[in-house]
């Protein structure tokens, strides 16, 4: 019944299978890509009617993780998959950026790629399979693509390159997470996060991944040959006939406009030129389609003039040199009540970054198929419409904003201190207040500056730069440093590089041509390093090390360690004790299973008092210790005295004073403040107290114990803490 075609390939020790003809047969292309027990169904459908009223390729890519793939039922009130998670959006963009360069430049048909994770094996990540499956589905769909691609993940473990490293392999620390997509002869996409990898090693990793793809691409070609579907015919767009006329009459004006230094000046002049061009062809510009074709022809001419400037005159838009960085202005500490802030301006691109420090309760809980984790470092990128002088509604984060934010986060992640060193939750918000290209890399720079201004102990600055490419005939090309928005639009590449002074922390490559070779990547790295060093120098001149103190508006935290068996005493029955502490001192208390206690609060004095109260609760009482206590209950045979927070002891009527007492109520009343001494502890740890304290004995005890005095409400207590029960609090020793 099914005419299934199945290809299996041994890919560096892992069996990759590609199957088509069994599932989703109404799609133009459908491939089930599997490795281990991970399977991803990739489908492609395109509209057979070409859109004539647009000048872009309408491609939509959607990656979806179904809970059933991991044997789960979605959590929450509604037990089904909801909106796309950030991870799903990021993988969707990863696929899109890998396959978009493959399409014919004249193809303008609505195209949709859907990748669904059908089965999940924790050892194998489905994102690589989604890229491979999408490439295979496109190859058999009838869509005119240049050539199929493969994709691979590369890691570095024990200084060796690993292809598609197993996710939960604990044989060593992975210094690199690199994804490479490529055809037989060129690279189409790169995405990477690294631990300060030098440029030479990164290039070798890219080459390793690129050269590993041959078996995958061969398998896709074999499936394509087996199906032999007719290829959809694409016709050249009619705007091409306007090009020569525009070039002849307006090239000088266009060149002069492109050389203007500011974005606003250029845009104003180019808009005037556009109107002149439309007026020149007024006899033909009688409908929207004709105007669109004329505008597209003008865009082609701008691209040609831009390329001639770069390749022949060795200059570029804004009259800059090929490797020239736009003027940079850095400023740190703009707002007093914000925990940290910085403004980074590069040319007409500007990012305003702010830092907020929070407690462990502010951590982001992220649930994926394979894990549920808490993230204490958050970075949000917000692209504001006024940054490009436009009006648009403010909505939830777009796919582009999510992608740019995650790229900046990956670039900064390496320098963020561990929770052991800096226990705060860190949230960075980067608001793009001006934009003329490379706003994600401006975010990296502003985030790094704001972290130091906030006093977060990062070890060094991270800077980012966007590199461009202009291809000429033959092997001729030029690499551009710090591209503007117009250069991104007219050029062939947007290669974002983030790095410290020691090495690369993040990469992202997008291209508009069919691919680039390793020589171009090497040249990009070499030129990017020079640019990044320049940017780092400017940043270090503004602020070169973290502030020694946090903002007075930031929450304070103190950490102490208690014995595991004492955790229940701090929590209390039904959480009574910990709730009382939080309410009394207006703090948050976080207790881990290993006995680490963190106390958070906005008022430092309250945090210290809460810590002292916890110390009082967990201390080990010793016979002879003397305390200031409070009568909390009186019965016929004696009284119960609260001698520390959460601790009561019993005073028998015979221990009230040295005389015989007939009526205890005549001597002690509820709420009385009394001095008590421990005279006994039974096998159930019940404490027996006496009011008949010996002053001389008290003096001797003060020589053996350290005093800590704390106030809870109107109760003042002096606590005797034995030296052998030492606890470390914020690098200072107290005694428990």
UniProtKB/Swiss-Prot annotation:
GO terms for cellular component: cytosol. SUPFAM superfamilies: Eukaryotic type KH-domain (KH-domain type I), Nucleic acid-binding proteins, Polynucleotide phosphorylase/guanosine pentaphosphate synthase (PNPase/GPSI), domain 3, Ribonuclease PH domain 2-like, Ribosomal protein S5 domain 2-like. It comes from the Bacteria. Its main location: cytoplasm. Its EC number is 2.7.7.8. It catalyses: RNA(n+1) + phosphate = RNA(n) + a ribonucleoside 5'-diphosphate. InterPro entries: ExoRNase_PH_dom1, ExoRNase_PH_dom2, ExoRNase_PH_dom2_sf, KH_dom, KH_dom_type_1, KH_dom_type_1_sf, NA-bd_OB-fold, PNPase. GO terms for molecular function: 3'-5'-RNA exonuclease activity; magnesium ion binding; polyribonucleotide nucleotidyltransferase activity; RNA binding. Mg(2+) binds at residues 488, 494. Residues 555-614 form the KH domain. GO terms for biological process: mRNA catabolic process; RNA processing. Pfam families: KH_1, PNPase, RNase_PH, RNase_PH_C, S1. The keyword Magnesium applies. Its cofactor is Mg(2+). Gene3D superfamilies: GHMP Kinase, N-terminal domain (3.30.230.70), K Homology domain, type 1 (3.30.1370.10), Nucleic acid-binding proteins (2.40.50.140). Coiled coil: none annotated. Keywords: Cytoplasm, Magnesium, Metal-binding, Nucleotidyltransferase, RNA-binding, Transferase. PROSITE patterns: KH_TYPE_1, S1. PANTHER family: POLYRIBONUCLEOTIDE NUCLEOTIDYLTRANSFERASE (PTHR11252), POLYRIBONUCLEOTIDE NUCLEOTIDYLTRANSFERASE 1, MITOCHONDRIAL (PTHR11252:SF0). NCBIfam families: polynuc_phos, PRK11824.1. Involved in mRNA degradation. Catalyzes the phosphorolysis of single-stranded polyribonucleotides processively in the 3'- to 5'-direction. Belongs to the polyribonucleotide nucleotidyltransferase family. This is Polyribonucleotide nucleotidyltransferase.
């Amino acid at each position: 019944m099914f005419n299934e075609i199945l290809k299996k390939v041994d890919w560096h020790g892992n069996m990759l299978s590609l199957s088509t003809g069994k599932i989703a047969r109404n799609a133009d292309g459908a491939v089930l890509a599997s490795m281990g027990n991970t399977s991803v169904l990739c489908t492609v459908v395109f509209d057979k009617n070409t859109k004539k009223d647009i000048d872009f390729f309408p491609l939509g890519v959607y990656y979806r993780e179904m809970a059933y793939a991991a044997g789960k039922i979605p959590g929450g009130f509604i037990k089904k998959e909801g909106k796309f998670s950030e991870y799903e959006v990021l993988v969707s963009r990863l696929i899109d950026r890998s396959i978009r360069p493959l399409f014919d430049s004249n193809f303008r048909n609505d195209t949709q790629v859907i990748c669904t994770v059908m089965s999940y094996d924790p050892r194998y990540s489905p994102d690589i399979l989604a890229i491979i499956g999408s490439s295979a589905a496109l190859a058999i769909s009838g869509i005119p693509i240049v050539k199929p691609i493969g994709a691979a993940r590369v890691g570095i473990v024990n200084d060796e390159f690993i292809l598609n490293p197993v996710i939960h392999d604990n044989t060593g620390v992975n210094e690199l997470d690199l994804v490479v997509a490529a055809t037989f002869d060129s690279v189409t996409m790169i995405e990477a996060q690294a631990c300060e990898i030098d440029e030479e090693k990164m290039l070798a990793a890219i080459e390793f991944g690129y050269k590993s793809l041959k078996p995958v691409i061969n398998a896709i070609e074999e499936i394509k040959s087996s199906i032999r579907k007719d290829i959809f015919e694409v016709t050249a767009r009619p705007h091409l006939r306007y090009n020569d006329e525009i070039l002849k009459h307006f090239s000088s004006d266009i060149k002069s406009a492109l050389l203007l230094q500011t974005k606003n000046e250029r845009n104003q002049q180019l808009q005037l030129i556009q109107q002149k061009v439309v007026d020149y062809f007024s006899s033909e510009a009688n409908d929207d389609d004709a105007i669109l074709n004329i505008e597209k022809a003008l865009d082609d001419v701008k691209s040609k003039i831009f390329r001639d400037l770069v390749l022949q005159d060795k200059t570029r838009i804004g009259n800059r040199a090929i490797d020239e960085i736009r003027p940079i202005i850095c400023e740190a500490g703009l707002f007093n009540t914000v925990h940290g802030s910085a403004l980074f301006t590069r040319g007409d691109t500007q990012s305003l970054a702010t830092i907020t420090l929070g407690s462990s309760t502010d951590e982001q809980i992220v649930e994926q198929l394979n894990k549920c984790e808490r993230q204490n470092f958050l970075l949000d990128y917000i692209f504001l419409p006024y940054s490009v002088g436009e009006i648009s509604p403010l909505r939830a984060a777009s796919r582009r904003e999510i992608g740019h934010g995650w790229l900046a986060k990956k670039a900064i992640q390496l320098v963020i201190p561990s929770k052991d060193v800096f226990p705060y939750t860190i949230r960075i918000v980067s608001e793009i207040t001006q934009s003329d290209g490379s706003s994600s890399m401006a975010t990296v720079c502003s985030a790094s500056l704001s972290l130091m201004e906030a006093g977060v102990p990062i070890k060094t600055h991270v800077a980012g730069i966007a590199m461009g490419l202009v291809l000429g005939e033959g092997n001729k090309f030029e690499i551009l440093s710090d591209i503007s928005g117009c250069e991104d639009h007219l050029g062939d590449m947007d290669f974002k590089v983030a790095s410290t002074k020691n090495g690369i922390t993040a990469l992202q490559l997008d291209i508009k041509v069919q691919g680039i070779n390793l020589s171009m990547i090497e040249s990009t790295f070499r030129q990017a390093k020079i640019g990044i060093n320049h940017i780092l120098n400017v940043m270090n001149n503004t602020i070169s090390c973290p502030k020694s103190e946090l903002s007075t508006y930031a929450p304070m935290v103190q950490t102490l360690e208690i014995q595991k068996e004492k955790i229940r005493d701090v929590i209390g029955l039904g959480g009574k004790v910990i709730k009382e502490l939080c309410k009394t001192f207006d703090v948050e208390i976080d207790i881990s299973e290993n006995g680490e206690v963190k106390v958070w609060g906005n008022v430092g004095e309250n945090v210290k008092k809460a810590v002292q109260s916890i110390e009082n609760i967990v201390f080990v009482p010793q016979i002879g210790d003397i305390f200031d206590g409070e009568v909390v209950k009186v019965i016929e045979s004696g009284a119960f005295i609260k001698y520390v927070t959460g601790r009561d002891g019993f005073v028998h009527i015979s221990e009230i004073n040295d005389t015989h007492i007939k009526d205890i109520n005549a001597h002690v009343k509820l709420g009385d403040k009394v001095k008590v001494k421990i005279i006994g502890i039974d096998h159930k740890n019940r404490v027996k107290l006496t009011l008949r304290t010996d002053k001389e004995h008290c003096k001797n005890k003060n020589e053996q114990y350290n005093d800590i005095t704390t106030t809870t409400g109107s109760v003042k207590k002096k606590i005797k803490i034995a030296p052998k029960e030492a606890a470390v609090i914020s690098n200072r020793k107290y005694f428990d």
